[in-house]
Amino acid sequence: NIRESEQKLSTLAVNSGVKITIGQPIPSIKTYNPNLILKSLWSGGTSAEHRRQVTLDDPAVIIFTSGTSGRSKPALFSHRRMIGAGIAWSLRTGMSSDSKCYITLPLYHGNGLAVAFSSCVEAGACAVVRDRFSVRAFLSDVRTYNCDSVVYIGELWRYLSQSPQQLDDSKNPVQVIFGNGLTFPLWDMVLERFGIERVVEHYGATEMPASALTNWTGRPGYCGFIPPGHPDTDNVVLVDEKFKVVAPGEVGEALLRVPGNIYRGYLDPQLDENKLWRNLFESGDLWWRSGDLLSRDTEGFFMFVDRMGDSFRWKGENVSCVEVEEAILSTGKVREAVVYGVSIPGESGKVGMASILPIECLEEGQTLNDFLYQLQELLPSYGVPHIIRLVEQHHETTSTMKIIKANLQIEGFKQIEKYPHFILYQGRYVRLTRDLLSALELGRLNLGFR
């Protein structure tokens, strides 16, 4: 990602054992100018001797994980997975040599490279690559270049859905969209507003050991489908905290069987071990831990629920950050919401905190209490955020448009001079002043938790 700081790029390069870069110079790393390389006398081919040394399971690329909740990790993507992804996704989307795919996600991201670009290579299709996503340019681009497919992450459609609606939004050549993160509340609206015929939603991770779960059926809100009796049914299991398989409809961590018991997910083998679970159901089996919570119904449809690090426990209940965020957005008063758990002195567990970019001013008492009433109608009492802060600009994101929660969790509720904060006190949201904050930090503020 060329927008990263020199220091971060240098750290990532050193940690990953990079010896040569092509393009942007990185301190202490030998760099080649791509324009000079293209002007050289290189034939464009690779010697047969060198090709014979490369196997399907050798790394094709190293993709850094997004780093939304911690440090980015270098994940390996083999030639086998790259070819397999291209075949699978080109078939799922009906891509052909006549197709044009609009790629506005970076090519150092799994969706941009392995899902979309590899499909174009496999199908012989045209990849229309934009430097970065733009709400304003989206429809103009797909019309200008006659793109019939678009790769996405959920945030892309959330930003587009918040843009002013035009009468001709549906007059565009896009027929199929594919990616992950298109939630149930957005699904039908996106198809209707933009005139899209089909969605292929999936669940996957850059470092996962097998093919992604895909939902090609068009059933809204689901990220995967494995019909009962299919050979792959037993290769994906959902388990509880004690690694017992959960019943249909219940939520559990997704485990994927490692094919052939051979797994290389990261450049650092120690990181591989942290993701694996051995001898779980029978001697010699090997499973990859996703760290994500999913549910599966009796028909075999999977729904993404939350990341395990994206939930917190309060009043003996697990609170899903995603569920609370969706409730906040559904009020119609908020443009962007980030939910996370924060510690309160003297209390066990974590209370919910939401950092909110409102559409209009929320600070006035009645408006804020109307907002609280809406949340109380949508959420159980333990799910209503106890602390909210209001911001005037979009939150900091990764290069793949994912909001970085780690920094917000570190800040907690101590930036009251910089952002207006409100705390749920005596049944309503009140301004968190310096005096109230001091009382809260000393455990002297009775918030009615007990």
Show the residue positions of the predicted features.
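ATP-dependent adenylate-forming carboxylate-activation enzymes
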Residues: 1-11, 25-27, 125-144, 319-324
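AMP-binding/adenylate-forming catalytic core of the ANL superfamily
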Residues: 204, 242, 256-286, 291-383, ...
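Conserved pre-ATP/AMP-binding loop-to-beta segment of ANL
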Residues: 44-64, 71, 94-100
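Short beta-strand->loop structural element characteristic of the AMP-binding/adenylate-forming
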Residues: 1-20, 73-76, 103-104, 125-132, ...
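Conserved AMP-binding/adenylation subdomain of ANL enzymes
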Residues: 83-100, 108-149, 163
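AMP-binding/adenylate-forming catalytic domain of the ANL superfamily
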Residues: 379-403, 419-447
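ANL superfamily adenylate-forming
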Residues: 20-56, 83, 210
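Gly/Ser/Thr-rich phosphate-binding loop
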Residues: 122, 139, 144-152, 161-222, ...
